[in-house]
A protein has these predicted regions:
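A short, acidic, amphipathic alpha-helical segment used as a generic capping/interface helix at domain edges
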Residues: 197-217
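Structured, acidic catalytic/metal-binding patches in enzyme active sites
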Residues: 2-197
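C-terminal structured interaction module
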Residues: 210, 218-249
Length: 249
């Protein structure tokens, strides 16, 4: 979960973007990783993606989804805020947001680190632009999005269960267990979604991380833990030796 790229000043940390509200504390090894770093690298700027959640004109999302999926989503969708109205969202935005409406969560690693980086004047940058994130998400086939939403609506308790199990594995720093939990998640099992969210982005990120390997600054690269496990993970794509960093009490 926390790796040193051998012979460099770069480390790699697998994060959780959201924590269960029942387990909100940042673990000590994550705090230690932040304290070690003189500079940080994150996936992307979440705030910069918000303007892309909605379409500019065109047909309502209602016309892209199966009638029953639309009916059930629309009945429980927030009536205000960045996700409203449902009809204006891009299909991938509805798919990404829908599970969080079934979860009891608090912010995860990245927002906390970003605030602390600003407080301590630590520099940071991103592995991808908002436009690149959106291009990846736009590549998800509509059929996969519809299937993912149907699977979600078939068991609205699954997102919270999966989050809690994944966070428990993450707190143990057990990458294999994280992957095993994710593999049981219906959405993760859909190749079109997995490829866009994980595989393709890992491919794009690897050369950008490699470019940073010569930095004299202690640099911490923070990506979602799922990017570090399974076939085609970021460590594999880097083609560079890494060492697990032991946790010091």
């Amino acid at each position: 979960m926390y790796f040193q790229l051998t012979g460099t000043h770069v480390r790699l940390l697998g994060s959780m973007h959201l924590f269960s509200a029942a387990s909100p504390r940042t673990p000590a090894w994550v705090v230690q990783a932040f304290d070690w770093a003189e500079a940080l690298v994150f996936e992307s700027d979440a705030q910069a993606i918000l303007p892309f959640l909605k379409r500019e004109g065109g047909q309502s999302l209602e016309h892209a989804l199966p009638p029953e999926v639309w009916r059930r989503l629309d009945a429980s969708w927030p009536s205000a805020g960045v996700l409203a109205p449902l009809g204006e969202l891009r299909p991938w935005a509805a798919m990404m947001a829908a599970p969080t409406l079934c979860q009891r969560v608090v912010e995860g690693v990245e927002p906390r680190m970003l605030r602390e980086a600003a407080t301590q004047a630590k520099p940071y940058w991103y592995l991808e632009t908002a436009e690149e994130v959106v291009a990846s998400l736009e590549s998800i086939p509509l059929s996969a999005i519809c299937t993912g939403l149907e699977l979600l609506l078939a068991d609205l308790t699954e997102p919270q269960r999966t989050l809690e199990r994944m966070q428990a594995a993450w707190l143990r720093r057990d990458l294999q267990s994280i992957y095993d939990v994710a593999a049981e998640s219906p959405i993760f099992s859909l190749a079109g979604i997995r490829s866009a969210i994980l595989d393709g982005r890992n491919c794009a990120w690897a050369p950008r991380v490699r470019e940073a390997l010569g930095t004299p600054k202690r640099t911490l690269v923070v990506v979602g833990a799922l990017h570090l496990c399974g076939e085609g993970n970021l460590i594999e794509r880097l083609q560079y030796p890494v060492e697990q960093i032991p946790f010091c009490d």
